[in-house]
Amino acid sequence: MKVTIAHNNYDKTLKTVAYLKEILKKKNVVFDAKYPDVVISVGGDGTLINAFHRYENQVDSVRFIGVHTGHLGFYTDWRNYDIDKMVDALLLTDEAPAKYPLLEIKLITESGETKYHLAVNESAVKRVSHTLEADVYINDELFENFRGDGLCVSTPTGSTAYSKSLGGAVIHPRLKALQMTEIASINNRVFRTLSAPIVIAPDQWITIVPNADHFVMTVDGARIDVRNAKKIEYRISHHSIQFDQFGHHHFWSRVQDAFIGENNSND
């Protein structure tokens, strides 16, 4: 087994990483940052998502483990005080990994060039200082003419992130569905949109055709300035992000822990 560690640079994280490296070396674990079997992310969700994008070209052969050292971690199963237990489980457990759907993004330019991206959580299309005007298609059939600040397309696990703050539903990852949420849509006698999140089946796709030469597309929060784009296609990828399943909390436990916490009722 070949392992690498991805981490942020906070003091608490660096102390955890130093201890983790010490334990792994004692267990004679091989470190390989180029072609790892397992990526251990120490920090928070942002650290893990950055680690995914670093190894997304190896997504079918890499598994992820998240160690949480901050205040909130949706993708992190272990705490910094669980390092010994986590390493023992890593070396002794041979369970099939838990798999979560990924978002495939296909950006097609006016010249016919195609650029591909993968997202763990979501991708959004926006304009910086102007209203976004875009035609939205589902399975190549026109669905609506959108006017507003932007549009967000998310995975099921991404439904707990930016999409949720936009009023989207929280979707279990086994559904493998896409969700599109509107960002401050304009609705009046001239412009009409659905003004509600939509959820589509895993064998369907969403196409956004912006009526602008220049706009911003985000992929898991990373900004991409886009010029001369013809359209953007979104669908559930045939790839998945894989998490080692030992100690893996089920989806609704993660949601409850992240957004509700302990029951503080005085009853």
Swiss-Prot record:
One of its GO terms (molecular function) is metal ion binding. Keywords: ATP-binding, Cytoplasm, Kinase, NAD, NADP, Nucleotide-binding, Transferase. Its cofactor is a divalent metal cation. Pfam families: NAD_kinase, NAD_kinase_C. Its main location: cytoplasm. The keyword Transferase applies. It comes from the Bacteria. The active site is at D45. Involved in the regulation of the intracellular balance of NAD and NADP, and is a key enzyme in the biosynthesis of NADP. Catalyzes specifically the phosphorylation on 2'-hydroxyl of the adenosine moiety of NAD to yield NADP. Belongs to the NAD kinase family. This is NAD kinase. It comes from Lactobacillus acidophilus (strain ATCC 700396 / NCK56 / N2 / NCFM).
